[in-house]
Amino acid sequence: MASSNLIKQLQERGLVAQVTDEEALAERLAQGPIALYCGFDPTADSLHLGHLVPLLCLKRFQEMGHKPIALVGGATGLIGDPSFKAAERKLNTEDTVQEWVDKIRKQVAPFLDFDCGENSAIAANNYDWFGNMNVLTFLRDIGKHFSVNQMINKEAVKQRLNRDDQGISFTEFSYNLLQGYDFACLNELHGVALQIGGSDQWGNITSGIDLTRRLHQNQVFGLTVPLITKADGTKFGKTEGGAVWLDPKKTSPYKFYQFWINTADADVYRFLKFFTFMDIEEINALEEEDKNSGKAPRAQYVLADLVTRLVHCEDGLAAAKRITASLFNGTLSDLSEADFEQLAQDGVPMVEMEKGADLMQALVDSELQPSRGQARKTIASNAITINGEKQADPEYTFVDGDRLYGRYTLLRRGKKNYCLICWK
């Protein structure tokens, strides 16, 4: 695929929400490799699924020979982006933000190639140019190029200005200037010609384009990817437990894999275009195959495999599939201690218990049963398994052999109701 066709390919995948001067950008891409960047503010100690589409777009550009720059906002993370936010963000300490910067840089690194010649990726931090800038320099060299009239008319902040209960502080109002200067600065340092980001960043991106033109007389471009929505109108990237994170300590590979397995049929083929590198033709063929097979669609498993491998590598995918298979067939012999740690983290409901507890008490404490009386009936009806083995004795008390790796016992009621006991 020719680099000049990259915008068209992104559009075919539904990955372009807005683009500035599409024709001129296509011409610029046709002339040869460019440098581009995407910013990631450290608003938490991990990126989440919402960051994955722009991050993978950086990867798509690099695979076509372009030079990606992942900018982690050590400075902008101290301020907070007000774009489309209903209320002022809580300001975090410098130490906290720096810790998050380090974590996010490490998280971004595996997606890009930092050692591949001329288009090797760069990791940047905007604290490098803002950290020692004084307020007079900021106001004279940056502020004078921004019209407050235009800033208050940007959709991203207009909503806040129009709310009686929530105004906007000067701190957050200034964010637009900071991100705008990032673009101008990266244009000067690395010849960056394109910024990509989520569609909520459009106002910040266009500010950067204007500022770069004013400061350096260079034409640069902006491209936004859509904010991902689900066909049923519910928010993408959320589970009952909250956001789906890229950090395995916050969302285990098993839970991550299950998130994709549970994708609705109405969303799955679109998500294959957004989150994987499968060819459009392959995705269309898979959709056709699923329609005509008369069986459960295969697409969810393809999606879960590809995205889990991208984020958690081969080992993470193997563990997720191993845990999934073990829970499905009821045999736990293949599970490692690390697999049980994933289950305890967020895979199934978990309860901590003292040794000496009996089965009835475990069912009540785990909320698999409402009372000891009901637990007794359920056990007697042969509906309970301990580590995959049926147990029909209501008076059963756990023994050391039930404690896998000396710590874990998996209870199941019926076919799908699990609880993991972690013994104290």
Curated annotation (Swiss-Prot):
InterPro entries: aa-tRNA-synth_I_CS, aa-tRNA-synth_Ic, Rossmann-like_a/b/a_fold, S4_RNA-bd, S4_RNA-bd_sf, SYY-like_C, Tyr-tRNA-ligase, Tyr-tRNA-ligase_bac-type. A motif ('HIGH' region) lies at residues 42-51. One of its GO terms (cellular component) is cytosol. It catalyses: tRNA(Tyr) + L-tyrosine + ATP = L-tyrosyl-tRNA(Tyr) + AMP + diphosphate + H(+). The keyword Nucleotide-binding applies. A motif ('KMSKS' region) lies at residues 235-239. Its EC number is 6.1.1.1. GO terms for biological process: tyrosyl-tRNA aminoacylation. The keyword Ribonucleoprotein does not apply. It is found in: Cytoplasm. Residues 357-414 form the S4 RNA-binding domain. L-tyrosine binds at residues 37, 175, 179. GO terms for molecular function: ATP binding; RNA binding; tyrosine-tRNA ligase activity. It is an enzyme of class 6 (ligase). Keywords: Aminoacyl-tRNA synthetase, ATP-binding, Cytoplasm, Ligase, Nucleotide-binding, Protein biosynthesis, RNA-binding. ATP binds at residue 238. Catalyzes the attachment of tyrosine to tRNA(Tyr) in a two-step reaction: tyrosine is first activated by ATP to form Tyr-AMP and then transferred to the acceptor end of tRNA(Tyr). Homodimer. Belongs to the class-I aminoacyl-tRNA synthetase family. TyrS type 1 subfamily. This is Tyrosine--tRNA ligase. It comes from Enterobacter sp. (strain 638).
